[in-house]
Amino acid sequence: TEMQAACGLAQMDKLDSFIQARKDNFKYLRDRLKSCEEFLILPEATENSDPSWFGFLITVKPEANIRRVDLLKYLDQYKIGTRLLFAGNLTRQPYMRGRNYRVSGELSNTDVVMNDSFWIGVYPGLTKEMLDFVIKKIEEFFGVNF
């Protein structure tokens, strides 16, 4: 509708600040969660890229001996929102049963994403205090820096 278009156009004026806030939040999480790299694979930008981050993707390392679900339940206790990555290994989805398809390789990385990865937010409205709370709870879960 015209009203939705007007709202969208008004948001366009704020786009650069939204993108910068997402980048700043991503960098803040990345820098501060280095304390947990023994347990987690943290995201990083592809060389020569300049992403506007959707979220902060975290992967629990297999050698951490921690199940993703346990970390997610812990974060949920503190009202920290998380989301699973969209698909992971599509060949493991119920829809694919009984269908003919071709696979190139073992798809082991897609299994890792499906089983061990999740997002936390980098929404532009998050404050440093909010991000610090998320970081503190992740560090507490792993027994780091507290």
PLM ranges: what are they?
Residues T1-F146:
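PLP-dependent aminotransferase class I/II
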